[in-house]
Amino acid sequence: MANSSLLRVVLVALLLLGSVTVSAGDGRGTPIAFQAEVSKMLDILVNSLYTNRAVFLRELISNGSDALDKIRVLYLTSPKEPLTKDGEAPTMDLRISFDKEKSELILRDGGVGMTKEELAKHLGSLGTSGTKHFLEKLQEGVGAVGGDQNNLIGQFGVGFYSVFLVGDRVRVASKSDDSDEQYVWESKGDGQYFLYPDPRGNTLGRGTEITIELKPDAEQFLSAETIKKTIHQYSEFINFPIYVQEEVEVASTAATPESAAEERSLDEGAVEEDPDKEGDTQGVVKEKRWTLVNENRPIWTRPIGNVTEEEYHKFYKAFSGDYRDPLYFNHFKVEGEVDFDSILFVPTTVDPASFSDDNAVPNTNIKLYVRRVFITDEFRDLLPRYLNFVKGIVDSNDLPLNVSREVLQESRILRVIKKKLVRKTLSMFADIAAQDEAIANGKQVENPAPSGHTHLKKPAYTKFWELYGKHLRLGVMLDSNNRNRLTKLFRYKSSRSESEYISLQTYVDRMKKGQKGIYYLSGDSVARIKKSPVLEDAVNHDVEVIFMTDAIDEYVVSQLTDFAGKKLINLAKEGVQFEESDARQRVVDRKRKEKYDSFFTHLRALFGYSEVRKVILTKRMTNEAFIVSSSENQITARLASIMRGQSMSLANQQLTAERVLEVNYRHPLVDEMFKRFTVDEDDEVATDIAWVLYDTANLQAEFPVADVAAYSKRINRLLRSSVDLSADDSLLPPDDAEYTVSDTETEEEEEQPKVDTNAHEEAETDGEGDL
């Protein structure tokens, strides 16, 4: 906001102080002085608006494009054919050349040009916009041409002065159709300028030529490669061709008059002879050649439906640097509160950086343009973090060109664009999911025209979900406004669909009559979830269960409590019951609880009151004796395990979920324990069985086992007991005496080098893979 406030103060001051005083002179080189305050304001303005010096080129190219747009519009109603003094016609393009000996960078356009008065008005007074006045003329009916005026890039009077970031001296030669003479505006940015007829005469025919005498620390801009790189970054999609003059080495050949004429042409690839060129001993000479830089046209400005899929793919590769085709794309135009064009792409591979949780790192995948001029790609939230894998461009006519990124960040217009972008992005995903489902169901997918969307020829949403499902689930936690849209995009495997993903809506559509909610179970893999004892109960009741296999799912369900009016129910939590009890059954359940109360109190005391929150009779239809579940309103064992693994803090390392022990009274081992308990509470066998069943149930539920060594010893005791071995039975004595070894075998063994048998076997095993 500081830059925004400064800009307003500066512009107001310029309006008050922007008058100029013309010194006496003959009008051909007499300096024209700004007031001292204006000179100071110029310095503040340049240094506060522009932190990257390379933007001067963006500004000058934008101005040149603006001038070309103006003449194109004017010539629609009043065409003219101006010529230079040498009889050459100006071209509808921008050209950049160099004079390395003089450290000069030269930019030339064939645009509308300026008269002497316009040079003084637009360049001799800060804050004046030539484009603004041009639009005023159009609105007054001078050369009205409909919507074309919206293509003009504005605020010439401010952007031009960024040239003094790199230039010690600037000369602007300009020729307008409204003037017979070509004039030069010249300044060092020191509070004064010169305005005089160009002594070279009419060298332009029409247009403007800017010659920048570069500062010593800005001579990198004498490099064609640097200029081309800057053009690609900022001005790739300007409407008019941009040529850069380069020196190339070519074989020395005798030129014919015809070839010489071709070299003098201004078409792309035309060559200008360097009068100082010298051939080497190999017959090679250096020539200057015009190279077209902005070959990629702004396809987003074309009508949606008139761009082929191949063109979208080619454009994506050009602007993103990715050699692969995108997975999806969406080309759309938004009109209303804010107007903008956009094309969004989904890459076919995941960038690991997209999982970074560093909010300070900007997302550079979305490039912001204003009237086809690149402004920035360093927004932290043009798309939210969970959509930072999406690449694309946004081009708006409603944003100002010459403001800082910081000011844009606070722009109301930009906030509207952000909201629209998120909705359009999620809409793209939903469209692809719908196409994918239609294909899977054998339906014909229609591609409405005009489209601009990816048209699927085969199912592709599964790949998208496997690549970016984690990002969408993150969105549920970060973006409550779009939570419902996001959950419709979720896909999971289930107990009825182990090989294919289904949506939550598909699950709801095929729920059993009277089913309470959406049942799910999380785990490291489908294979592990299938072995869960709590899944057995659901399968026995013919209830479908969603399989959640990503760690982030545990966090998601803490935010996503329901879908389509159906509650999400975790099978790993206590109290899961698929059948309602009638009155008689409730009485039976109450009496059964009374029967086992003292036994359950004993078990809780045995395992520890601090570890087991309560012991209950399970209502699950299962073959397991014990099931350890999580308390209904607390975190699950899996989430606690994930949090311990993700955090280095002592508190989280000790984090555990509350345990509820569910006991299956119908299991034979439980029945045996109960009988022994009624006789002797301290029965050793019953105690060992209880501990082994409890620790095993903990492992199945992903709860940690407190004492693994004790667990191992109890299993050992139970195994001994099962084969009638006493706990006191010790190891057998060595059986060496059973083996007969002759003296000869001993002598032969002594003669052999000592070999590590185990190492030898490992080496043989390692070598098997090479056969």
Curated annotation (Swiss-Prot):
Induction (free text): Not induced by stress conditions such as heat, glucose deprivation or treatment with the glycosylation inhibitor tunicamycin.
Residue spans of biased composition, Basic and acidic residues class: 752-762
Effect recorded for residue 159 to D: In OB1; defective lipophosphoglycan (LPG) synthesis with production of a truncated LPG form lacking phosphoglycan repeats; defective addition of phosphoglycan to acid phosphatase
Region annotation Disordered: where it falls in the sequence: 254-282, 727-771
Residues flagged as site, Important for ATP hydrolysis: 405
A GO MF term: ATP hydrolysis activity
GO cellular component: endoplasmic reticulum
Main location: endoplasmic reticulum
Glycosylation sites: 63, 306, 402
Pfam families: HATPase_c_3, HSP90
Cell compartment(s), UniProt: Endoplasmic reticulum
Knockout mutant characteristics: Defective lipophosphoglycan synthesis and reduced levels of the surface glycoproteins gp46 and gp63.
Record keywords, A-Z: ATP-binding, Chaperone, Endoplasmic reticulum, Glycoprotein, Heparin-binding, Nucleotide-binding, Signal
Glycoprotein found in the keyword field: yes
Binding site for ATP: 63, 109, 160
Residue span of motif Prevents secretion from ER: 768-771
Signal peptide: 1-24
Complexes and interactors: Homotetramer.
Family: Belongs to the heat shock protein 90 family.
Function: Molecular chaperone that functions in the processing and transport of secreted proteins. Required for the synthesis of lipophosphoglycan (LPG), a cell surface glycoconjugate. Necessary for the attachment of the galactosyl residue to the mannose within the phosphoglycan repeats of the nascent LPG chain. Also required for addition of phosphoglycan to acid phosphatase. Not required for normal growth. Has ATPase activity. Binds heparin with micromolar affinity which may facilitate infection of host cells.
Name this protein carries in UniProt: Endoplasmin homolog
Lineage: Eukaryota, Discoba, Euglenozoa, Kinetoplastea, Metakinetoplastina
Gene this protein is translated from: LPG3
